[in-house]
Structures are given as structure tokens and as C-alpha cells.
UniProtKB/Swiss-Prot annotation:
Changing G23S: In strain: 129Sv. Interacts with SLAMF1 (phosphorylated). Interacts with CD244. Interacts with Src kinases HCK, LYN, FYN, FGR and LCK (via kinase domains). It holds the Pfam family SH2. It comes from Mus musculus. One of its GO terms (cellular component) is cytoplasm. Residues 5-101 form the SH2 domain. This is SH2 domain-containing protein 1B2. Expressed in spleen. Expressed in macrophages, CD8(+) T-Cells and NK cells. Conflictingly found only in NK cells. The keyword Ribonucleoprotein does not apply. The gene is Sh2d1b2. GO terms for biological process: adaptive immune response; natural killer cell mediated cytotoxicity; negative regulation of natural killer cell mediated cytotoxicity; positive regulation of natural killer cell mediated cytotoxicity; regulation of natural killer cell activation. InterPro entries: EAT2_SH2, SH2, SH2_dom_sf.
Amino acid sequence: MDLPYYHGCLTKRECEALLLKGGVDGNFLIRDSESVPGALCLCVSFKKLVYNYRIFREKNGYYRIETEPSTPKTIFPNLEELISKFKTPGQGMVVHLSNPIMRSGFCPGARRLNLEANVYENTDEEYVDVLP
């Protein structure tokens, strides 16, 4: 999966600089989480602040996002559908997503995202021990 607004291992500070440039509400990008291994962050600008929403990949390969507690939990088959939902106002984010910030050039983390797409298939939890 090669999303043009996925920036890989962009730091939180670098992310804030990109999103706040121009002062437009609804700028967004996806980056790797610095504090939760394997998680992604959907980062969006609103009123000169950057809000971060963690995205987790479920065992079945679907994606789940942390939003306001009052918002029903929804899972998505891919990141494109997740982003599409939150482009609509009133979906549980501080502001709807309106302007993707595209990465410029090579993104070292993009290949990692592709490799992790099927990690859930390689866990020990789904295997049965065979007795001799």
C-alpha cells in the first residue's frame, strides 16, 4: 500500500511543522507512532494545533482508530476507507480531513508498512501444536 500522505518515521515535531505551515484547518497526514510500536498516527491540524489519532491494525488485517469515547468504534478494511470516512464532518474528530499533506520523495517507512500488512498471518496464536 503506497499512500502519498503516509510519511513513515516522521517525528512529531517534523509533522507539526508540515501541518501548521499555511495555518489551514484540516491538513492531515499519516506517520508511524513514536510511542506505540506498530501503530500509526493520523495527524490533523485545527486552530494552530495538531491532533494525533492512533490507528491500530487488528489481527484480521482491518484498521481501527481511536476517536472520542462517545463515537462508536468502527473498523476499516484499508486506510483509504478510514480516511474517506473522516473527510465527512461530524465523525468524531476535532475537524474533518480536508487537505492531505503529500510526502516529497522517498519514504523509508513506506516499505515497512507494506511488509507489515500480513504480520497477523504469522502469529503463533493461530497455530495448533501437533502431537507426535
